[in-house]
């Protein structure tokens, strides 16, 4: 089980990313738009740098919904590999069966 502080830190980052998502997208679009002047694009780059560090989506880490484990998580289930295995063997995940051939 991950430390509670790490799980809460990740939740805090998710809130910050959601809060600044619109502004982040607008600034990125301005920077990538070749029709804008160089000064406008440079100003957008500076404004993007002024956003909080944790407002960047790349800083988010997928964690297991049960244990908080940061590695080996499956997006489809939102769970870590060990918990998927446990729940699948018990039959708690619909449609997931052990492979046999």
From Swiss-Prot:
InterPro entries reported in the protein's UniProt record: Ribosomal_uS14, Ribosomal_uS14_bac/plastid
GO molecular function, one term: structural constituent of ribosome
Coiled coil: none
GO cellular component, one term: cytoplasm
Keywords: Ribonucleoprotein, Ribosomal protein, RNA-binding, rRNA-binding
Entry superkingdom: Bacteria
GO BP: translation
Function: Binds 16S rRNA, required for the assembly of 30S particles and may also be responsible for determining the conformation of the 16S rRNA at the A site.
Subunit structure: Part of the 30S ribosomal subunit. Contacts proteins S3 and S10.
Family the entry assigns: Belongs to the universal ribosomal protein uS14 family.
HAMAP family in UniProt: Ribosomal_uS14_1 (MF_00537)
Protein name stated in the entry: Small ribosomal subunit protein uS14
The species this protein was found in: Leptothrix cholodnii (strain ATCC 51168 / LMG 8142 / SP-6)
Classification of source organism: Bacteria, Pseudomonadati, Pseudomonadota, Betaproteobacteria, Burkholderiales
């Amino acid at each position: 089980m991950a430390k509670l502080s790490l799980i809460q830190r990740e939740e805090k980052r998710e809130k910050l990313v959601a809060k600044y998502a619109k502004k982040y997208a607008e600034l990125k679009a301005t920077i990538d738009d070749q029709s804008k002047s160089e000064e406008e694009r440079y100003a957008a780059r500076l404004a993007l740098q002024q956003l909080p560090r944790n407002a960047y989506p790349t800083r988010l880490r997928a964690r297991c919904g049960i244990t908080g484990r940061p590695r080996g998580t499956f997006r489809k289930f939102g769970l870590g590999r060990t918990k998927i295995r446990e729940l699948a063997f018990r039959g708690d995940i619909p449609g997931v069966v052990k492979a046999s051939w």
